[in-house]
Amino acid sequence: MHGNDRISRREAIKLAGMGLLAAAVSGACAPKKVTAPPVRPYRNFPMVNVSSDRIVRQAVGLRPFRPGGFVVRYDRIGNKDIVHNYGHGGGGLTLSWGTSHLAAEKALSLGHRSCAVLGCGAVGLATARLMQFQGYDVTIYAKDLPPNTTSNVAAGQWSPFTVFDENSITPQFYNEFIRASRLSFGYYRKLIGPHYGVRVVDNFYFGYSVADLPDAIHELPEIYGRLTTLIPGQYPFNEPTCVTLKTMLIDSPTYLNAMMNDFRNDGGKIFVRNFGEIGELLTLREPLIMNCTGLGSYFLFGDRELEPVKGQLIVLLPQPEVDYITLVHGAGIYMMPRSDGIMLGGSRDYGNWSLAPDPEVTERIFTRQSEFWSGQPSV
């Protein structure tokens, strides 16, 4: 004891007589209780206003899923050389540049100088641009153009996930998948900026541990970088765990519009046309056909391994201040902010060909999103 804590001899005698000396000494010498500093928020979290009067529309897209993964393959039909590039599941926007690079490699060895590209979504446009970069005269033929493609429905997170069934792929395919992911990331990184609508944002995986994250995140450390585990108090949501990382967010309407303009400005031609059978392809003037029809390959080329995976979104009014992505493990929902609105998902309905919103799915997404943003724990 020292300073003001010193007890005088007279006070000691007095306290001893009262039986209080031991208590006084022990109290003076006891360590002071240390209060842990408050947990600081990881960042500012502008909150999404989930309200029925803010719903702009609902969106439905059919992901072209193949358990064995996407197809990048050469084919010869009649008098045409055909290079296939389809079947990306939920990763079409993400992988578009990478698989198109692989497809272009196959096409360049054939010696043509002009080609037809079937499809005008993310994969078709990336393929068309890469062929233009190589000096090809390129014409796109497509049933639907932006903003009416499946790629326009994509919420936009750069994420090579839900592309295949891990029990149905070969080691050779997986190596091709990893290469395509790396290639695609490299192309997108050069497009970061408002013109193409590509930006880097924080992703928050609530209800996840690092081990729970998709395998591709662990396979591509040079892309995903640091994985940070957060604790309650660092975020304003009623979730026990959270892992955060950074990825690109692709504002698909902005991106697809810019890509289509680039293609046309470099001399590319686009025709709206629906091919009902392969025989119609043989009438095209181009000797080389790049098939980027997605789910259309089920009908046009008879690929019965393809199946639709229906995805449904609720689109809220835009909130420009929301600049991060949330994915909630227990509830199976996600939020991604785009310029045209806040995208609330998610759903995966395998084998469902309907493009009509399912009211039960809408109610589930809305209810779980409302609970999450109001601070209730996820299911």
What are the functions of these language-model segments?
Residues H2-L20:
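N-terminal secretory signal peptides and thylakoid transit peptides that target proteins
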Residues P146, M248-P318:
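Predominantly flavin-linked oxidoreductase catalytic cores and closely associated redox partners
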Residues D144-A180, I231-G233:
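Glycine-rich active-site loop/strand segments that organize a redox cofactor
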Residues G91-L95, F173-R182, V243-A258, A356-P357:
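Short beta-strand to alpha-helix junction loop
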Residues R113-G121:
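Beta1/beta-strand and adjacent pyrophosphate-binding region of the FAD-binding site
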Residues L15-G19, A59-N79, S151-V153, L183-D262:
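Flavin (FAD/FMN) cofactor-binding and adjacent substrate-gating region
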